[in-house]
Amino acid sequence: MIELKHVTFGYNKKQMVLQDINITIPDGENVGILGESGCGKSTLASLVLGLFKPVKGEIYLSDNAVLPIFQHPLTSFNPDWTIETSLKEALYYYRGLTDNTAQDQLLIQHLSTFELNAQLLTKLPSEVSGGELQRFNVMRSLLAQPRVLICDEITSNLDVIAEQNVINILKAQTITNLNHFIVISHDLSVLQRLVNRIIVLKDGMIVDDFTIEELFNVDRHSYTKELVQAFSY
């Protein structure tokens, strides 16, 4: 379970980015955080990951095995390491897997799942496309077997086929390994396919919180309706 109680945060004392955030996410629930750029979505993710401490309030995680997948994969990889080295480092660090043959077998399995060519393993991050690197980024996090996954705009560099592939993989992971994941996105179609609950942020505050089945209810907040209408165009 993840619980945020009256969480307030700002990068300086004069302006708070998030104000009085209250969220409870039970195990097995996948949640989307929706809102415009600058509303505090990524800051909220950073707080859950423990990268920042709230100015006020408390954050409780029942499981410490929480990992992120960030929007810009190039900054997530060591530029001097091959893709293979980065992936195997995750297997060693998070799972204690040192046997090279076992590592290779896991990589081969995941390459097939993510529809990636094994020849890319010898490349540096700068030598593969943005879409390929983002899929490797997702793969690396899943190889570490986290219980909770924080996904920040992870489909932004993917074409529609690769996007659906990643979505299918993440959904399958909730059945096997993940307790749940939190998806930060401005793309409503991604959230509709991935999560069963959406929390809407506006100006650092929660203005709406509903299940995916309630998305088009007439009692949705006016800002939620604006986002839905904008996306429909």
From Swiss-Prot:
The record lists the organism as Staphylococcus aureus (strain bovine RF122 / ET3-1)
Q: Which SUPFAM superfamilies match?
A: P-loop containing nucleoside triphosphate hydrolases
Localisation: Cell membrane
Protein name listed in UniProt? Nickel import system ATP-binding protein NikE
Question: Matching SMART domains, A to Z?
Answer: AAA
User: Which amino acids does the record list as binding ATP?
Assistant: G35, E36, S37, G38, C39, G40, K41, S42
Q: Which reaction does it catalyse?
A: Ni(2+)(out) + ATP + H2O = Ni(2+)(in) + ADP + phosphate + H(+)
Membership in a protein family:
Belongs to the ABC transporter superfamily.
Q: Which PROSITE patterns match?
A: ABC_TRANSPORTER_2
Q: How does it sit in the membrane?
A: Peripheral membrane protein
Q: How does it assemble?
A: The complex is composed of two ATP-binding proteins (NikD and NikE), two transmembrane proteins (NikB and NikC) and a solute-binding protein (NikA).
Identify one Pfam family in the record. Answer: ABC_tran
Pinpoint the ABC transporter domain residues: 2-228
